[in-house]
Regions:
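Terminal low-complexity/disordered tails
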Residues: 305-341
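Active-site-adjacent bridging/hinge elements
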Residues: 24-36
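Amphipathic alpha-helical domain-onset/packing element
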Residues: 1-25
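Conserved, well-folded catalytic cores of nucleic-acid-processing
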Residues: 4-11, 62-63, 160, 185-192, ...
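Extended hydrophobic secondary-structure segments that form protein cores and membrane-embedded regions
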Residues: 77-83, 199-202, 254-256
Length: 341
């Protein structure tokens, strides 16, 4: 244990201390002491008991792995960690990972924890996908993402939706309304997206292109649902450009609503009575559908209105779910099952 500690924080072997100190460059020496200082301050401060326990366990593991071999002064042990979330509370997992990041170690960890993924830069994540005849590994690679795209993905996926990195397919929708409607209507059709590895993700905040580029690089299938308004047409054009205007690929990856937005689409698909009821406007009152929808949103909210429509579809049965959405569900399930084991 003494020799291992000396390897990291002083020198390898007490007898060679003076000789090695003279040979080592000043920058390396300062770095070693900086690591030691950081760890000392961490374990000495109030509430540092958890750090001390982790540090002792770590060094015990390293000592057992080292055996009687003498480590080179530039050696950096490779620490393999298998599913640490199975033994650690999420808070302790965060503490342990933070401590490991301070040590000059190489680390490979396998995990099914979104909590751990949220602590790891996406550039350091490698997805393992079990296919019919092999296990494929997907990662961003040396070129990675642009600085702006990396920032957007980190905020939208890593920090807010880390579990989506385990998904087989992303269904990308414009906003919260579509998220509520699509999840509920899929459930009523007997499709359990969570069990199929499908994640519905809104893209308006982060932008569509970064999400699609990231999904492709990480081996995640994807499908995009867009509105029929001007913004939706631009999103559709973005998808087509990413697919090199391949018509067959477009059928697999793009669904466009034949209406301005989800509210107008569902109104025309037989749910006008829901909008009139929420807007408190009798159906026999002549009024432009845009005004009816606007009043319904004003008296409720877009997400609440979407939930009302979805619940009404549940009461009416599967036949009330628009055919366009049923076809989209089938495509998304097909994409997801193509990645199934």
């Amino acid at each position: 244990m003494v020799q291992l500690l000396e390897h990291y924080f002083s020198e390898q072997g007490a007898g060679q201390a003076r000789y090695r100190l003279m040979r080592r460059r000043a920058s390396n020496e300062q770095r070693s002491w900086r690591y030691l200082d950081i760890i000392n301050r961490m374990i000495d401060r109030p509430g540092g008991r958890s750090y001390r326990v982790i540090l002792l366990g770590l060094f015990a593991t390293l000592l057992q792995a080292k055996g009687t071999l003498r480590l080179d002064k530039d050696a950096r042990p490779l620490l393999l960690i298998e599913d640490p979330e199975t033994r650690l509370h999420p808070i302790m997992l965060s503490v342990a990972w933070h401590l490991l990041n301070l040590l000059p170690l190489q680390r490979i960890a396998t995990t099914n924890s979104g909590e751990l993924l949220s602590l790891t830069p996406v550039e350091h994540v490698c997805r393992l996908v079990r296919e019919s005849s092999r296990v494929a590994a997907w990662r961003l690679g040396p070129s990675g993402l642009s600085t702006e795209d990396s920032r957007r993905i980190s905020f939208h996926i890593r920090f807010n939706r880390p579990s989506s990195l385990f998904a087989r397919c992303w269904l990308l929708v414009e906003g919260e309304t579509e998220t509520w409607v699509i999840n509920e209507l899929a459930r009523q059709c007997g499709h359990h997206f969570d069990a199929e590895g499908i994640k519905v993700i809104e893209f308006a905040q982060s932008g569509l292109k970064p999400l699609v580029k990231f999904a492709r690089r990480m081996g995640i299938e994807w499908h995009v649902l867009v509105d029929g308004d001007e913004a939706g047409k631009k999103y559709a054009a973005t998808v087509r450009s990413l697919l090199n205007n391949d018509r067959e690929a477009e059928r697999e990856h793009l669904t466009a609503l034949p209406a301005l937005d989800m509210e107008h689409f569902m109104y025309r698909q037989g749910f006008s009575d829901v909008f009139h009821r929420v807007a408190q406007i009798p159906e026999n009152v002549p009024m432009n559908l845009r005004k009816v929808i606007s009043k319904a949103i004003h008296r409720s909210s877009k997400p609440d209105l979407a939930i009302e429509v979805a619940m009404e579809a549940g009461r009416r049965g599967v036949d009330s779910v628009p055919t366009l959405l049923k076809k989209m569900f089938s495509r998304v399930l097909w994409l997801a099952r193509g990645r199934a084991d």
